[in-house]
Amino acid sequence: MLHLFAGLDLHTGLLLLLALAFVLFYEAINGFHDTANAVATVIYTRAMRSQLAVVMAAVFNFLGVLLGGLSVAYAIVHMLPTDLLLNMGSSHGLAMVFSMLLAAIIWNLGTWYFGLPASSSHTLIGAIIGIGLTNALMTGTSVVDALNIPKVLSIFGSLIVSPIVGLVFAGGLIFLLRRYWSGTKKRARIHLTPAEREKKDGKKKPPFWTRIALILSAIGVAFSHGANDGQKGIGLVMLVLIGVAPAGFVVNMNATGYEITRTRDAINNVEAYFEQHPALLKQATGADQLVPAPEAGATQPAEFHCHPSNTINALNRLKGMLTTDVESYDKLSLDQRSQMRRIMLCVSDTIDKVVKMPGVSADDQRLLKKLKSDMLSTIEYAPVWIIMAVALALGIGTMIGWRRVATTIGEKIGKKGMTYAQGMSAQMTAAVSIGLASYTGMPVSTTHVLSSSVAGTMVVDGGGLQRKTVTSILMAWVFTLPAAVLLSGGLYWLSLQFL
């Protein structure tokens, strides 16, 4: 690992350490800000002692990051303006990363201090949008192009739909439990609050199987949170490393010969597909004429311009770099590796446009998505030590400051105390929906899903909601996005004044 940092001068080394500290601090805040959601219900239903619950959440957050894959990590990264992603080594790219992280840290710390379960995901996405808008305004480019609108809309869709799903499904579970699981005295215990059970049965803990279900569902929430939110931290660390130390991280320097061959085969197959469907490529790119591949033996200009009409030419360049004798990326110069990354990201954007075309069959869509995944496999990666560092930061953060937000979730959303059935329904809904989102690569808000699930159970159970708390949570939800947009955009503009 350390050899990848060899050759960095003092200034670059310090910049790298500072940037990594920023990302890991952001992830630690995410731990004590969002993971309160995983422990709130088990603590307030007395299924686990608070210290044990927090350690459990930290451990399963850690495992969630380690085992969760990278689909969400790069879904977030690709929301950034393409021109900044293609030029991550520039001072503008670094200013972007620092502004984005600082904005997210300021807002997350503020909402945590006041005990508001605001969304770290919303904050990060708002910060990314702020960067995109400021970059578009300063460079005079189209806001629509700068913001990667299709990606932004799909992520917004998941963030808006996920709390509604939480509300409806958790409420539905409570309805079913009330209808079919309250006929006998033994079954009806699941609908008691801890205080009611102590008064009625003289016992402080939930019934055995109810307690097991509460603990398992809390483990599910913690694991799902690590798999979804932890990946966002991994994506940010990779952005930093590509920007500050591109020589070691612009592509996966540890890629095996097999992985490089897989990338090369994908490039050949993408080119073959586009050569067979030139009309589709023209339609997707909006170009009257595609730039053809150069004649054999002709020299190509050194500078590559990313434009969809250049796709065939771009694929030809990639083939020229990744010849069959390249079994390790060490054989390519830094310039070649950087250009290879730029071209692959450019081709990837074109593939995304073609996949969305109405004339593309479902089989072709699957084929193109698979080829895109194979092509990007050696640039969309994360070393194990990065995954471990993010997992540790998230786990440590969980154990530090969980109490403020957990109190809001456990005590202040409903007018009455939380019953065992409500806690279990909210957690099961959150664990399943966040887990599915991580599997499909959609970033969702753990906070929104669990808060809305708790609210759904309270409404269906007839307990009602505390207006003051719900208003505060809704205000935090509404203002998180514009606040993050303004903060990151302002910080980015300010930082560029000094470059």
From Swiss-Prot:
Q: How is its activity regulated?
A: Phosphate uptake is dependent on the presence of divalent cations, which form soluble metal phosphate (MeHP04) complexes. In Mg(2+)-limiting conditions, the PhoQP-regulated small protein MgtS and sRNA MgrR both regulate the PitA transporter, leading to increased intracellular Mg(2+). Metal phosphate uptake is inhibited at low internal pH. Inhibited by the uncoupler carbonyl cyanide m-chlorophenylhydrazone (CCCP). Is also inhibited by the energy uncoupler 2,4-dinitrophenol and the sulfhydryl reagent N-ethylmaleimide.
What residue ranges lie in the Periplasmic compartment? Answer: 1-4, 73-93, 145-154, 228-232, 403-429, 494-499
Question: What does the record say about its membrane topology?
Answer: Multi-pass membrane protein
Transport found in the keyword field: yes
Keywords per UniProt: Cell inner membrane, Cell membrane, Ion transport, Magnesium, Membrane, Phosphate transport, Symport, Transmembrane, Transmembrane helix, Transport, Zinc, Zinc transport
Gene null: resulting phenotype: Disruption of the gene confers increased resistance to Zn(2+), associated with reduced accumulation of Zn(2+) when cells are exposed to concentrations of ZnSO(4) below the minimal inhibitory concentration (MIC). Mutant is approximately four-fold more tolerant to tellurite, and cell viability remains almost unchanged during prolonged exposure to the toxicant as compared with wild type.
Instruction: Tell me where in or outside the cell this protein is found.
Output: Cell inner membrane
Q: Which residues lie on this side of the membrane: Cytoplasmic?
A: 26-51, 115-123, 176-206, 254-381, 451-472
The induction comment states: Expression is not constitutive, as initially thought, but regulated in response to levels of zinc and phosphate in the medium. Expression is repressed by the PhoQP-regulated MgrR sRNA.
* Superkingdom of source: Bacteria
Its GO CC terms?
A: plasma membrane
Q: Which GO terms describe its molecular function?
A: arsenate ion transmembrane transporter activity; phosphate transmembrane transporter activity; solute:proton symporter activity; tellurite transmembrane transporter activity; zinc ion transmembrane transporter activity
So where does this one cross the membrane? 5-25, 52-72, 94-114, 124-144, 155-175, 207-227, 233-253, 382-402, 430-450, 473-493
Q: Which reaction does it catalyse?
A: phosphate(in) + H(+)(in) = phosphate(out) + H(+)(out); arsenate(in) + H(+)(in) = arsenate(out) + H(+)(out)
GO BP terms: namely: arsenate ion transmembrane transport; magnesium ion homeostasis; phosphate ion transmembrane transport; tellurite transport
Q: Which family does it belong to?
A: Belongs to the inorganic phosphate transporter (PiT) (TC 2.A.20) family. Pit subfamily.
Subunit record text: Interacts with the small protein MgtS, and this interaction contributes to an increase in intracellular Mg(2+) content.
Tell me the function of this protein.
Answer: Low-affinity inorganic phosphate transporter. Mediates proton-driven uptake of soluble neutral metal phosphate (MeHP04) complexes. It can use Mg(2+), Ca(2+), Co(2+) and Mn(2+). Activity impacts bacterial growth in low Mg(2+) conditions. Is also involved in Zn(2+) uptake, probably via formation of a ZnHPO4 complex. Can also transport arsenate. Involved in the uptake of tellurite.
Q: What else is known?
A: The Pit system in E.coli K12 consists of two transporters, PitA and PitB, which can transport phosphate independently of each other. Both proteins may have contributed to the kinetic values and substrate specificities determined in earlier studies.
According to UniProt, the name of this protein is: Low-affinity inorganic phosphate transporter PitA
Q: Which organism is it from?
A: Escherichia coli (strain K12)
Higher taxonomy? Bacteria, Pseudomonadati, Pseudomonadota, Gammaproteobacteria, Enterobacterales
